[in-house]
């Protein structure tokens, strides 16, 4: 079976809780499960090194992850998250590249492929991405087709892909795939995984 490193930490729950209502406002999602999301971000920060170029998606977890980046002396961050870019813009030690496109009023994400020309010019060391679902057959999937276009381009340019997924996302799938399972290097999840052998 497929094998890749899996990181777990007790009491990690949801990084982004979107159960039946897929259109919860970003502000509402950001306010949920702050403790759990911060634990996920803390583990993800262990994969950061000085001088790296990393990609962040437009999730509420990425915005929390931003506070772990400001302690570094030299990082380049590529993101389609407007709020994440704004949170990092006042730190001269960080170079922030915001991908252009249509701004979503609900999530503050940049959608579509208007800015796709710049992505192939960037060498990304690690892409940190969330998803609505993950299966070995379909990989990482999400429900926003337009945002997935950007995510797919980012992970294709990344040397390493780190998925931020709680147990409820495993063995579930959504509308659009943006990263194959065999391309994912690490998944940071929790210890509530019901059938670990199906994942690890």
Which role does the model predict for each range below?
Residues 27-71, 75-80:
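Helix-turn-helix/homeodomain-like alpha-helical modules used for DNA recognition
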Residues 85-198:
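Conserved phosphate- and dinucleotide-binding cores of soluble alpha/beta proteins
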Residues 20-27:
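Conserved catalytic alpha/beta core of Sir2/sirtuin-type deacylases, generalized to analogous enzyme cores
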Residues 10-18:
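Minor-groove-contacting beta-hairpin "wing" of winged helix-turn-helix DNA-binding domains
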Residues 1-2, 199:
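Low-complexity/repetitive intrinsically disordered segments
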Residues 2-9:
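Short, small-residue-biased leader/transition segments that mark boundaries at the very start
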Residues 12, 83-84:
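Short glycine-enriched loops at secondary-structure junctions
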């Amino acid at each position: 079976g497929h094998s890749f490193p899996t990181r777990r930490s007790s009491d990690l729950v949801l990084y982004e809780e979107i159960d039946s209502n897929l259109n919860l406002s970003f502000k509402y999602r950001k306010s949920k499960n702050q403790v759990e999301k911060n634990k996920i971000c803390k583990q993800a920060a262990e994969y950061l090194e000085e001088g790296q170029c990393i990609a962040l998606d437009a999730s509420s977890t990425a915005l929390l992850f931003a506070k772990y980046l400001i302690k570094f002396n030299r990082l380049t961050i590529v993101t389609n998250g407007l709020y994440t870019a704004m949170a990092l813009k006042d730190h001269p030690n960080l170079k922030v590249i915001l991908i252009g496109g249509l701004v979503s009023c609900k999530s503050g994400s940049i959608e579509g492929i208007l800015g796709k020309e710049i992505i192939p010019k960037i060498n990304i060391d690690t892409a940190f991405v969330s998803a609505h679902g993950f299966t070995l057959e379909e990989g990482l999937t999400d429900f926003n087709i337009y945002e997935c276009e950007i995510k797919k381009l980012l992970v294709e340019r990344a040397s390493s892909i780190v998925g931020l997924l709680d147990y409820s996302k495993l063995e579930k799938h959504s509308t659009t795939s943006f990263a194959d399972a065999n391309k994912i290097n690490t998944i940071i999840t929790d210890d509530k995984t019901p059938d670990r052998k199906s994942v690890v």
